[in-house]
Amino acid sequence: MTVYHFVGIKGTGMSSLAQILHDMKHTVQGSDYEKRFFTQTALEKRSISILPFDKSNVKEGQVIIAGNAFPDTHEEIVAAKELNIPVHRYHHFLGDLMNQYTSVAVTGAHGKTSTTGLLAHVMQGAHPTSYLIGDGTGHGVENSKYFVFEACEYRRHFLSYNPDYAIMTNIDFDHPDYFTDINDVFSAFQEMALQVKKGIIACGDDEELQKIQAKVPVIFYGFGEDNDFQARNIQKRTDGTIFDVFVRNTYYDTFKITGYGNHSVLNALAVIALCHYENVDVEAVKHQLTTFEGVKRRFNEKPMGEQVIIDDYAHHPTEINATIEAARQKHPEREIVAVFQPHTFSRTEKFLDEFAESLSKADQVYLCDIFGSARENKGELTIEDLQKRIDGAELITDTTTDVLKKHKNGVLIFMGAGDIQKFEAAYVKEVQVAEK
């Protein structure tokens, strides 16, 4: 019996892949640092063994899958090579696995995780579908027809894949620690487009995506009239969003989604376009769109007393704009309060003015210290550089969150890709203690 051993099993992609293989009835185990990470919960539910790093974990007959964060000098990878066991890097293993199915890569600077989650949910309503989402969620079905997965452009990782289809949500400049400018980002997506085997579903409202060249059909979606799939007559309600879809200027159907904001309409439109292309029953698509509950750390909302708390992964100005817009649609009468932790010094410095502009769309802004990456030089930048660009912005720590209590009927949006949840947890605890 083959044992799949994951070196770095708590990584979001690695955890998802481990879950998929386990669900397909393979024997799976893995190793990682002992510090608790949110991806553990799904692994523990499946009784997948998580071991501390140790070269003795590696044994003959195993299939070794290594996370990209771990160099060839890692003790377990060295041990595998000493035993002449091939080491498969995460992206290469995933690339080989998906060739067994009709594969759909979901990529773009923003909206990947939400769109992957939505597509997987909708496809499952019609056909057996395995999926891998970048929030640490994976699900494998032995007789899958489709394999839906999130494909990240960072360090051009997505070039490990040759999917049947690709959904491209947008192209935007991000990851300034790797990409030099928007042209560098575009070149990565252009290279990816040439690897797609059947078709590309791309947002035609995005100026960069309009320039994409491909060997396969490119289907455009969006709000503009030039798109193949266009959303019209949009009704933004507090219980979701309703819109008509026109296919090449001919009415197709009316859809209701559970999401808020223009970006949610675009994500749904991408899914509708792909399903139309694959002849998925439209009634199944309509039903599944109304039952989607979202993905982890993407506009996750919970009431707390008179306040509403939203947890969101937004860490780029474009994403902050979208999250605040969605909150205003759902809660038009409430005060919108942004609690933001910038992620990486390089990104914060590059987009300092854009961050200030997007955050200023909230009624009140609180800023947490910059969450730095282990790989980067801190430099001269401080959180005060952002604070002075936003009228009335205040600094907050995980010991001073009680200041948020004064926003009696407020919607508190905790945003960031670092450990912003630490601040949210501190505030929730503060409120619970006060109520006792």
Swiss-Prot record:
Key word ATP-binding present: yes
Q: Is this entry keyworded NAD?
A: no
* Molecular function per GO: ATP binding; UDP-N-acetylmuramate-L-alanine ligase activity
**Entry EC no(s):** 6.3.2.8
Binding-site residues, ATP: G108, A109, H110, G111, K112, T113, S114
Catalytic reactions of this protein? UDP-N-acetyl-alpha-D-muramate + L-alanine + ATP = UDP-N-acetyl-alpha-D-muramoyl-L-alanine + ADP + phosphate + H(+)
What main location does UniProt list? cytoplasm
Its UniProt pathway annotation is: Cell wall biogenesis; peptidoglycan biosynthesis
What does the record give as the function of this protein? Cell wall formation.
- Record's protein name: UDP-N-acetylmuramate--L-alanine ligase
Q: Which organism is it from?
A: Bacillus cereus (strain AH187)
Q: Lineage from the top down?
A: Bacteria, Bacillati, Bacillota, Bacilli, Bacillales
Q: Which gene encodes it?
A: murC
